[in-house]
Amino acid sequence: MKMLVGLGNPGKKYSHTRHNIGFKVLEELARRHQIEKEESRYDAIVGHLRINQEKLLLVKPLTFMNLSGKAVRPLFNWFKLELSELLVVYDDMDLPPGTVRIRASGGTGGHKGMQSICESLGSRDFPRIRIGIGRPPGGAIDWVLGEFSESEKPLMQDAIEKAASAIECWVKSGIDASMNAYN
């Protein structure tokens, strides 16, 4: 079993914002593969599906971004997972828009949702996929809570699809194969 966490903020108000790109990747995976079961558990929506017979949990924390660890840790413990079985997808202002980067571990890059997860798990040693949203011309909060422009939308849709494919590769062949194929 593997757990995929897409970071975002709950509610319609935030559904199309840059900060919710992690949720969008989970939605793309749910579109590609049939969800067997969906439940609300530990401050998160959890979808269950299979890719090549591997059970995958799609987790959307219902806490706000900065408290994502509050939802992730109890699920991680409940399902008795190893750090290598967790993958987190999130936005990154330090990458150009539409860029997808896969890593086996790493820092938080100042991302509050990742900081919360790393603190709650007591480790940064788990796979992650960062999706570039670019640097803001103004304030960071307005940028991440803003929606993509019409010209950005096709680029971001390509990134969502690429990230979903990278996750499928991770499930089937591991993080090294995913990094080699999609970085």
Swiss-Prot record:
The record marks N9 as: Discriminates between blocked and unblocked aminoacyl-tRNA. It is an enzyme of class 3 (hydrolase). GO terms for biological process: protein quality control for misfolded or incompletely synthesized proteins; rescue of stalled ribosome. It is found in: Cytoplasm. Hydrolyzes ribosome-free peptidyl-tRNAs (with 1 or more amino acids incorporated), which drop off the ribosome during protein synthesis, or as a result of ribosome stalling. HAMAP family: Pept_tRNA_hydro_bact (MF_00083). This is Peptidyl-tRNA hydrolase. The gene is pth.
